[in-house]
Structure formats: structure tokens, C-alpha cells
Amino acid sequence: MRARLAVAGVCALLLSGCSSDSSDDASADPSPAPSSTPPASSPAPDPEPTEPEPTESDAAAEPPARPVSVLGLDQQTHRGDRLRLGAVREDTADYTSYDVTFRSRSTSPAGQTESWTISGVLNVPKGRGPFPAVVLAHGFIDPAVYERGQGMTRERGYLASRGYIALHVDYRNHAESDDDPRYQLRMRLGYSADVINAVKALQASRDVPVADDRIALFGRSMGGGVILKALVAEPGLVRAAAPWASVSSLEGENYDRFQRTDPDDTSRPDDPGRVHGLPEDNPEFWLANSSRPHFDRITEPVLMVHGRVDDTCPPRWATATHRALVAAGVDSQLEWYDDAHAFGPAFDAAMDRTIRFFDQQLA
């Protein structure tokens, strides 16, 4: 991760959304399975030691962010590698599709490294290359029923048929990926880390003919929020990004719409509102896990695509996110289509617009 100027700490979660494939069984109101119980209360701390006088180097050091926050994600060092091609899923006149895995590693400022094997699907166009690439971040599908490559099958094929390598990231805890037992308590920030590391794994690969300086991100629903957090945490990583039918860029809104439950419901011990406090009780935490307060860190052009009759992620969310991006100085465009969340009749037109955007930005 490049050194970068410090900005006040925050970090992120995406708690909702669904997939684009009309055949995918995606819930618009996800209720994730419990993963772990909240930690027990810590013992009383020792008396605080006397602070030494700050030095000039101390003043220049980047201040620590909340560990569970978007800026906490930024302060980690991310390394993606070991992209391995597996079985051929599909072989068409335009592209070959493979099952793949890659390694997603993140190291904290304290030097603690976590490493996960992430599964996915890779479509590679026919020809010699090198080809531009798009990393795909899918929407919410219950990990208990999710299957490898599910959620953006149409988009993956469309991109590859137009000459783009398309890497669909399953995320940790999905399909053949390793399980992170704390992914819920960490507000699913690991999903954004996996997307960042997917880009780096493509760039490190000798087996995939990728133009490693011509890569973009493409996320649907929950995945739209995933890629916005990746842009905040790793400015300059890619050349462009396209959030489709995205969840809100304020995590409190996502929680209220998709995850808030009866206060007496104890069936989900990893409910973030129960563990970290509800948005109205701990607003600082929820802002720290939102991308919007840190849009001024984003350096890439953004194309937002949204349906006017989306009843899963309300159109007002897209309007608010776009306005906040523009106010922060981001080159953002918002395209509207007369369609719903999953994009049926307007899919081809929306994909053609998105590919024109990628063609312009990755040229």
C-alpha cells in the first residue's frame, strides 16, 4: 500500500443488496447466519503511562484509525497474489471461463497478517492480449446458499465478449473461499480487502494476459458499497469504477433498511447493532464504517447506474451518493434507467453505457 496522507479514521460494512442474475436466489433483506459471539468485557486497564514528549517524527506519523473502520482498512497493507486457474467452466467463441483462486493478505500497522484463499470465476477473451480487466463485486446472497461466480454472470460474459478480462470475486466466507469467523463483527470490511487484493493478484499473475495498468471495479448492490470502500482505502489502485444499483454510502441507512431487528431477538449474536451499538446510539462508529465521509480520498472517475423503480436500494440513495461524490471533487456521473433493482429490460443498454465508460477511462 502506498504511503498516503492521514485522514481521520473510519471504516466500512455493507449489509445488504442482492444479485443481478434473474435466476439467482438473492434476498433483499439479508439475515446472515451467526458467526461468533461478542467478546467478553475486558478487565480494567492498567494505569495509563506517562506520555513522552512528542518528537518531530511522531508528529509526522500517520495517526491510528479505528481498527474496524474504512480508514483502518486503508492503514493495512494489502497483498494479493497466487492467482491459480482451475477447471474450465465454459469455452465460447469469444472467451474461456475458469474457476480460480487467489490469496488475499492484509497486514495491520502492528504487523499482524491475515491470509485467506478466495475463490472466484475468471473470463479471459480469446486472443493474445494483453487485455484490460474488470474486477466484479457481487451483491448480497446468503453465503449458506451462494455458489461460485453467482450474482454477476451476465455482466462477466458481456465484458469478456467485449474484450475485457472479468474476475468475479466470491469474497471470504463464500463458495470455496476460506471462512473468516469475524467477518460480520468486522462489518464485512474483508470483502473490500478481497476486491483490492483481486486487483493485485491480477497484476502479479504471469498466467493471465492482463494490462495491469488498465483495471476497473464493477459492483452491484452490496458490491457497489464494497467497491466504494475499496476506492477510499486504496486511492489510485484502479482507473475507474462503476457501482450499479448500489446500497447507501451511509452504513446506518443500510442497517436500518436491511438488518435492524427486534431488540429482544437474540438469534443473531453478531448483529452489528447489538455488538457495536445502534446507529442512533453510536453514530461515530457507523460513520467510520461509511464511505461517504471519505469521498475526498477517491481519485478515480465513477459511473453510477441505478433504476428509477428500484425498490431494494431506493433511488434517493443513488442521488445522495452522487451528490456527495461531486461535492468531494470526484468525477462522478449518474445514469438512470427505467428498470428495477436487477436490471431486466434495460440491462443491455446499461451494460453498453458502462462499457463505453470503461473504454474511455481505460484507453
Predicted feature locations:
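C-terminal catalytic histidine-bearing segment of alpha/beta-hydrolase fold enzymes
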Residues: R316-A363
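N-terminal low-complexity, Pro/Thr-rich disordered segments
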Residues: S19-V68
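Short beta-strand/loop motif that positions the catalytic acidic residue
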Residues: I298, M304-H306, D310
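Short substrate-entry loop that stabilizes the transition state in hydrolases
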Residues: R128-F131, L136-D178, L250-E251
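C-terminal motif of bacterial Sec signal peptides marking the signal peptidase cleavage site
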Residues: L15-G17
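Alpha/beta-hydrolase active-site loop
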Residues: L185-R206
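N-terminal cap/lid segment of alpha/beta-hydrolase-fold proteins
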Residues: Q75-R128
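Hydrolase active-site cap/lid region
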Residues: L228-P279
